[in-house]
Amino acid sequence: MKNKIYIAIICAFSIVFAVSSGFLIKHYCDSAKQAEMYDNLIEVVETEPEETTELMNYSEEKTFIPEYQELYLQNNDMVGWIKIEDTKINYPVMQSKDNPNFYLKHGFDKAYTDYGCPYVQENCDMELPSDNIIIYGHHMNDGSMFAGLMKFKDKSFWEKHKTVSFDTLTDRQTYEVIAVFKTVVYTDSPDSFKYYQFVNAETAEDFTAYVEKCKKLSLYETGITAEYGDKLLTLSTCEYSRTNGRLVVVAKLINE
């Protein structure tokens, strides 16, 4: 009887080990695949386009930035490119209005992946644009996707990295960070700030109230604010010190 119990325990542990190993191998393979794919996309973005490249019209007034045109032709859900120095944040940004959270679990190539791809909230208008463009990205343990936003918790990092590059398909843009804060979502707790509900201000007072709330929650004072008429960029990722925690970086457009 003892031998049977012993054998059963060994078998159980073996199954658990095999399943765990399978998950680890799958995760490693996924990580390697995503890293290779985005490295290839970065190479396209950082390679000087050929002078003979014929630029497509994005609208009546604007043409594509050459390197982004090539990527757009691969996936027309692409709406921009985000980069933050000294982090791994150097990615295409997507938007799927018909399937809002598609890129939560799909990469640039539209294949399923736990890494997803940074994406814009579905009710944000990239054309007008909206007063606030909200971008989501995963906080991955290997430091990829939006895990690099965690560095902004340290004021000394912000002091050396006060700007974020977020280009649209037609315009190169720089944003200046005005606030970095932590909050919780999916709860009616007093600690919850539903920053994702602010896309367009109906009045100047609405805009000011949102900015003041962000500044009040900020982990440190940046000395920078925004006024009605400014365009905002809000970057959001998971923050694991609390259940349903989020780290949010808010910036304002300073050039276009």
Which role fits each region the language model picked out?
Residues 1-14:
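N-terminal Sec-pathway targeting helices
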Residues 17-256:
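Solvent-exposed, non-transmembrane regions of membrane-associated and secreted proteins
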